[in-house]
Amino acid sequence: MNKAPHETRVVVGMSGGVDSSVAALLLKEQGYDVIGIFMKNWDDTDENGVCTATEDYEDVVRVCNQIGIPYYAVNFEKQYWDKVFTYFLNEYKAGRTPNPDVMCNKEIKFKAFLEHAMSIGADYVATGHYARVEFRDGEYKMLRGADPNKDQTYFLNQLGQAQLSKVMFPIGHLQKADVRRIAKEAGLATAGKKDSTGICFIGERDFKEFLSHYLPAQPGVMKTLDGEVKGRHDGVMYYTIGQRHGLGIGGSGEPWFVVGKDVRENVLYVAQGFENEYLYSTSLKAVDVNWVSDRKPEAPFRCTAKFRYRQPDIGVMVHPLADGKAEVVFDAPARAVTPGQAVVFYNGDECLGGGTIDEVFRNGEKLWYVG
C-alpha cells in the first residue's frame, strides 16, 4: 500500500450486522476514506417469506451516520438470481446439497461488488469476514480468522490473487467478543443485533418450505440399501446425506439416517445407527477446484481439509488433476461427506483453496449418493 490512509478509498460491504459495522468503524478510525455499501441481492416481493432487507438497510444507515461515512445501496438481484440462486436450485434438482455462501462470495461479494467498488474509485473493498490476508513470498496468502469459532475461510475458498490484492478483512484478527465490545463501546446501533445464520441473503426461513416454492414436492419411497421400504419422502431434494430429523421412521433402537439418493428413481436410501458404515467414506473427487495462489500444485501433497463448515480438520492426501479437478484421500474414514458441499484445503492457518465435492467413495466404491 503506497498511498496514505486518507488518500486510500475503501468501500465496505455492509450487511446491517455487527461485523461489517465494526469493520467500517475500524477503517474510519485508521483514517481511510470509507464508503459503506449495502448490497440488495434478493427481491423480497418474490414470495411470501420474511425478508429483513429493509430493516438491515435502516441499520446500515444508522451505523454509517454514527461513524460519519457516506453510504448507499446497490442492487445485485439479477446477478444473484443468475449466478447464485439458479445454481442453488439446479444443484438441489440434481440431488446435491449446494453451498450458496461459497457461490455468493465468488460471484457477488468478490466479483460484482468488487467491480462496482473499483468503478467508483475504490482502492480496496472490505467486508466483515473472519479471515486474514498477508502478503509474503511474493504472493497474497489467505489465513484463518483469529477466532477459531468464527473463521470463514471455508466460504472464501474460491478467492484468488486478483481478489486478495484488493481486499481488507478489518476484523479478521479479532475475537467475536471483541467485535461486540468495540461496537458497544462506540454505541453502534448494531451492537446487540444477533448474527444471521440463514442462507446468504435469504435469511431465517423454514428451508423446506422455502425450497418448495421453487421445487414442488415429488413424493417417493424411502428404502434401506437391501430394498426394504421404511416410509415415504416428499422429494429427495429436501434431504441431505447424514440427515436424521424429519424422516418419520419409528421403532426401537438407534435413529435412522439418510445415506443415499437415487434422483432418477426418486428413492431416498436410509440406514440405521450413528456409526453405520454407509455414512462413512474414504475419498472424494472434487470439481471447480480453485488454488488461492492461482497455481495448481504439480504433485500430490499432504494437508488438512474440511468437508463442512465448523468441522474439525482431517488429514488428507490431495492429488491435483486436470480441468480443475482433484482426488482427495482421507487419513481416516469421514462421516456424511456430501456432494455439492465444499472441500477446503489448509496448511496450518493458511487456506490453500478448495472445490465442490462431486463424487464420494468408500474403499474405491462410489457411494449411493446421487443416482
UniProtKB/Swiss-Prot annotation:
One of its GO terms (molecular function) is tRNA binding. Residues 150-152, 308-309 are annotated as: Interaction with tRNA. This is tRNA-specific 2-thiouridylase MnmA. Keywords: ATP-binding, Cytoplasm, Disulfide bond, Nucleotide-binding, RNA-binding, Transferase, tRNA processing, tRNA-binding. It holds the Pfam family tRNA_Me_trans_C. It comes from the Bacteria. Catalyzes the 2-thiolation of uridine at the wobble position (U34) of tRNA, leading to the formation of s(2)U34. The active site is at C104 (nucleophile), C200 (cysteine persulfide intermediate). The lineage of its organism: Bacteria, Bacillati, Bacillota, Bacilli, Bacillales. The gene is mnmA. One of its GO terms (biological process) is tRNA wobble position uridine thiolation. ATP binds at G13, M14, S15, G16, G17, V18, D19, S20, M39, G128. Its EC number is 2.8.1.13. Residues 99-101 are annotated as: Interaction with target base in tRNA. It is found in: Cytoplasm. The record marks H129, Q341 as: Interaction with tRNA. It catalyses: S-sulfanyl-L-cysteinyl-[protein] + uridine(34) in tRNA + AH2 + ATP = 2-thiouridine(34) in tRNA + L-cysteinyl-[protein] + A + AMP + diphosphate + H(+). It comes from Geobacillus thermodenitrificans (strain NG80-2). Belongs to the MnmA/TRMU family. Disulfide bonds join C104-C200. GO terms for cellular component: cytoplasm.
